[in-house]
Curated annotation (Swiss-Prot):
UniProt gene name: rpsL
Keyword vocabulary terms for this entry: Ribonucleoprotein, Ribosomal protein, RNA-binding, rRNA-binding, tRNA-binding
Top-level division of the source organism's lineage: Bacteria
Organismal lineage: Bacteria, Bacillati, Mycoplasmatota, Mycoplasmoidales, Mycoplasmoidaceae
UniProt keyword Chloroplast present: no
Name this polypeptide is given: Small ribosomal subunit protein uS12
Annotated function: With S4 and S5 plays an important role in translational accuracy. Interacts with and stabilizes bases of the 16S rRNA that are involved in tRNA selection in the A site and with the mRNA backbone. Located at the interface of the 30S and 50S subunits, it traverses the body of the 30S subunit contacting proteins on the other side and probably holding the rRNA structure together. The combined cluster of proteins S8, S12 and S17 appears to hold together the shoulder and platform of the 30S subunit.
Assembly notes: Part of the 30S ribosomal subunit. Contacts proteins S8 and S17. May interact with IF1 in the 30S initiation complex.
Molecular function as annotated in GO: rRNA binding; structural constituent of ribosome; tRNA binding
């Protein structure tokens, strides 16, 4: 335990909270080549690689992922949610934060139904999360 004299000399430091999605915290101003520390909930990027990845130990699958170069210069791994996708290299995507627990290094999700990414076909429940349109009512 520190004495009062020690605390006066050197006060306790606050713990810095580390971001779980650091690529969303920076903006790049290309006019004056400055990086500003401003948080944005979504970022646009271009796919540089699209593929599948196997998850960590107890799980087994082929999870779809894309490597995306963001507008602020960061290059990150993103998860493509839902069944089936139309993403290729050079597709423009929108991404949000949110990691995938069983894929190491994947800290972001692609937003379905925006820019070049189409929504999930024939999705009935939780449609807004997968960018699916409301199905036509049978008459």
């Amino acid at each position: 335990m520190a004495t009062i004299a020690q605390l006066i000399r050197k006060p306790r430091k606050k713990k810095k909270v580390k971001s779980k999605s650091p690529a969303l915290h920076y903006n790049l101003n290309l006019l004056n080549k400055k990086v500003t520390n401003v948080y944005s909930p979504l970022k646009r990027g271009v796919c540089t690689r699209v593929g599948t990845m196997t998850p960590k130990k107890p799980n087994s699958a082929l999870r779809k992922y894309a490597k995306v170069r963001l507008t602020n210069g960061f290059e990150v791994l993103t998860y493509i949610p839902g069944e089936g996708h139309n993403l290729q290299e050079h597709s423009v995507t929108l991404l949000r934060g949110g990691r995938v627990k069983d894929l190491p290094g994947v800290r972001y999700h692609i937003v379905r139904g925006t820019l070049d990414t189409v929504g999930v076909e024939k999705r009935r429940q939780q449609r807004s999360a997968y960018g699916a349109k409301k199905p036509k009512a049978k008459s």
